[in-house]
Amino acid sequence: MLALKEANLQDAQKEYEFVRAIPENENGFTNPDFGVSFEEFVSVSLPRMIEWSEGRNLPDGFVPETYLFLWEENEIIGQFRIRHHLCPSLIEGGGHIGYFIRKDLRNRGYGKKGLALTLEKARKIIPENEIYLRVQKDNPASLHVMLASGGYIHHEDAHHLYVRIPK
């Protein structure tokens, strides 16, 4: 059974192993913890994730952001992030939600299922009437996930499609 769990210290080893496998930037999903040691992950990265989800110690211009891991039994399948509200840089940037599914598990429905679970949580947090997402034009699989989740293409630029999902 799939479940979302917020980043936490109890699952640090498995969270670290998952985060360590995420590239520094893939399809617009950035990994600020790329290349960190386990010790740094536990002492810096995880506390930051937890603090940011609570709106504490945010850098200037950042909004609260909840880090969620998608689990199937004892295995992490993906990471989803909910930014709690929009700021100017998020409106034409990453929007409310970003996600990453493990490469070896893509095209198996985990993106759709994980986004559905994330949307349930996001609808309780986000004050805007629509949930904003952005996808690179060369990532049709992720666009398909967003559209299958009730999204529509709101607009585009040279490199991205901007998707909205009604709340």
Protein language model regions, located:
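GNAT-family acyltransferases
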Residues: 1-96, 156-167
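Short aromatic/hydrophobic contact patches that present stacked aromatics
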Residues: 3, 98, 132-134
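Loop/helix-junction capping segments adjacent to catalytic residues or to phosphate/diphosphate-binding pockets
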Residues: 12, 91, 108, 140-143
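Extended, folded domain segments that form the structural surfaces/walls around functional sites
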Residues: 83, 108, 112-121, 125, ...
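A short, internal acetyl-CoA/4′-phosphopantetheine-binding micro-motif in the GNAT/acyltransferase core
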Residues: 83-85, 96-107, 136
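Conserved acetyl-CoA-binding loop-helix of GNAT-fold acetyltransferases
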Residues: 98-101, 107-121, 143-148
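Conserved GNAT acetyl-CoA-binding A-motif
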Residues: 122-134
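Conserved active-site alpha-helix within GNAT-family acetyltransferase domains
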Residues: 137-155
